[in-house]
Protein backbone atom coordinates (compact mmCIF):
# COMPACT_ATOMS: atom_id res chain seq x y z
CA UNK A 1 0.00 0.00 0.00
CA UNK A 2 1.35 3.44 -0.92
CA UNK A 3 2.03 5.59 2.13
CA UNK A 4 3.88 8.88 1.95
CA UNK A 5 7.07 9.21 3.96
CA UNK A 6 6.82 12.95 4.57
CA UNK A 7 3.94 15.34 5.05
CA UNK A 8 3.17 17.50 2.01
CA UNK A 9 3.52 21.23 2.58
CA UNK A 10 0.75 23.80 2.23
CA UNK A 11 2.50 25.05 -0.89
CA UNK A 12 2.50 21.65 -2.61
CA UNK A 13 -1.12 21.10 -1.58
CA UNK A 14 -2.06 24.45 -3.09
CA UNK A 15 -0.15 23.70 -6.29
CA UNK A 16 -2.03 20.45 -6.67
CA UNK A 17 -5.37 22.17 -6.09
CA UNK A 18 -4.63 25.00 -8.53
CA UNK A 19 -6.39 23.14 -11.35
CA UNK A 20 -9.52 22.27 -9.33
CA UNK A 21 -11.28 25.62 -9.76
CA UNK A 22 -14.39 25.63 -11.94
CA UNK A 23 -14.40 28.13 -14.82
CA UNK A 24 -17.02 30.85 -14.84
CA UNK A 25 -20.04 30.05 -16.99
CA UNK A 26 -19.89 31.68 -20.42
CA UNK A 27 -22.79 34.13 -20.66
CA UNK A 28 -24.23 35.68 -23.81
CA UNK A 29 -26.66 38.51 -24.32
CA UNK A 30 -29.65 37.52 -26.45
CA UNK A 31 -29.81 39.67 -29.58
CA UNK A 32 -33.64 39.70 -29.65
CA UNK A 33 -34.55 40.40 -26.04
CA UNK A 34 -31.26 41.48 -24.48
CA UNK A 35 -31.54 38.83 -21.76
CA UNK A 36 -28.40 37.15 -20.51
CA UNK A 37 -28.26 33.35 -20.80
CA UNK A 38 -25.68 30.58 -20.81
CA UNK A 39 -24.04 29.71 -24.12
CA UNK A 40 -25.64 26.78 -25.99
CA UNK A 41 -28.64 26.79 -23.64
CA UNK A 42 -32.21 27.95 -24.08
CA UNK A 43 -32.91 31.47 -22.86
CA UNK A 44 -35.58 31.96 -20.15
CA UNK A 45 -38.21 32.91 -22.75
CA UNK A 46 -37.74 29.63 -24.67
CA UNK A 47 -35.65 30.95 -27.57
CA UNK A 48 -32.57 29.20 -28.96
CA UNK A 49 -30.54 30.55 -31.90
CA UNK A 50 -33.36 32.84 -32.99
CA UNK A 51 -36.04 30.15 -32.92
CA UNK A 52 -38.86 29.59 -30.43
CA UNK A 53 -38.02 26.12 -29.08
CA UNK A 54 -40.39 25.94 -26.12
CA UNK A 55 -43.77 27.61 -26.42
CA UNK A 56 -44.73 29.86 -23.54
CA UNK A 57 -48.25 28.73 -22.66
CA UNK A 58 -50.27 30.65 -20.12
CA UNK A 59 -49.36 29.07 -16.80
CA UNK A 60 -52.28 29.61 -14.44
CA UNK A 61 -51.15 28.58 -10.98
CA UNK A 62 -54.31 27.37 -9.32
Curated annotation (Swiss-Prot):
Protein name: Large ribosomal subunit protein bL32
Molecular function in Gene Ontology: structural constituent of ribosome
Ribonucleoprotein in keyword set: yes
Top-rank taxon: Bacteria
Coiled-coil segments: none
This protein's record includes keyword Cytoplasm: no
GO CC entries: large ribosomal subunit
Signal sequence, start to end: none
Family that this chain belongs to: Belongs to the bacterial ribosomal protein bL32 family.
Organism field: Alcanivorax borkumensis (strain ATCC 700651 / DSM 11573 / NCIMB 13689 / SK2)
GO biological process: translation
Biased composition (Basic residues): 1-16
Residue ranges of the region described as Disordered: 1-62
Keywords carried by this UniProt record: Ribonucleoprotein, Ribosomal protein
UniProt cross-references to Pfam families, sorted A to Z: Ribosomal_L32p (PF01783)
Biased composition (Polar residues): 53-62
Amino acid sequence: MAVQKNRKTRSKRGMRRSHDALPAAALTEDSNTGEVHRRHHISPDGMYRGRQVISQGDSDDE
